[in-house]
């Protein structure tokens, strides 16, 4: 959460999150769900109005993480949680293999060695700062009404 708040302060001038121990009244609720082989490792349940404003609360489901090659369970959990929190902020998938919000299915050519190296590095060392350009682009259109 601290990482996301630092990114939000830099991009938007405000903090995005405040920790709350109770689900009641929370705007973003994180739930841990059983892992299933045919399901994604995380999922953001959210809805938006016609103007694109997200309705609250947003529910984030995170599956039990498993190590992926040289990437630890803890890193996988952080990467998936950070990605789903990005959706809670309204961020879509991106084609940037270095972004925490990568990737739209089929949008990145992992057969390209340079692209693959960047993608793997971003999964092994996920960085929420990778979404700064997306946040800076997304929110001003809501705040300038």
Positions of PLM-derived features:
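Metzincin-family zinc-dependent endopeptidase catalytic domain
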Residues: 1-88, 92-95, 106
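Cell-envelope/ECM-targeting effectors and their regulatory/trafficking segments
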Residues: 3-6, 141-145
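The catalytic-center signature of Zn2+-dependent metalloproteases
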Residues: 74-144
């Amino acid at each position: 959460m601290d990482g996301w708040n630092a990114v939000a302060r830099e991009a938007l001038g405000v903090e995005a999150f405040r920790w709350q121990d109770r689900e009641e009244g929370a705007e973003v609720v994180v739930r841990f769900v059983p892992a299933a082989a045919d399901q994604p490792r995380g999922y953001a349940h959210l809805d938006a109005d016609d103007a694109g404003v997200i309705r609250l609360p947003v529910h984030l489901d995170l599956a039990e993480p498993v190590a992926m090659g040289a990437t630890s369970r803890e890193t996988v959990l952080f990467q998936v949680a950070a990605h789903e929190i990005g959706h809670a902020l309204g961020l879509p998938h991106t084609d940037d293999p270095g972004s925490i919000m990568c990737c739209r299915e089929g949008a990145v050519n992992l057969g390209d060695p340079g692209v693959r190296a960047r993608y793997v590095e971003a999964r092994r060392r996920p960085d929420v700062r990778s979404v700064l350009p997306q946040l800076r682009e997304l929110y001003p259109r809501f705040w300038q009404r």
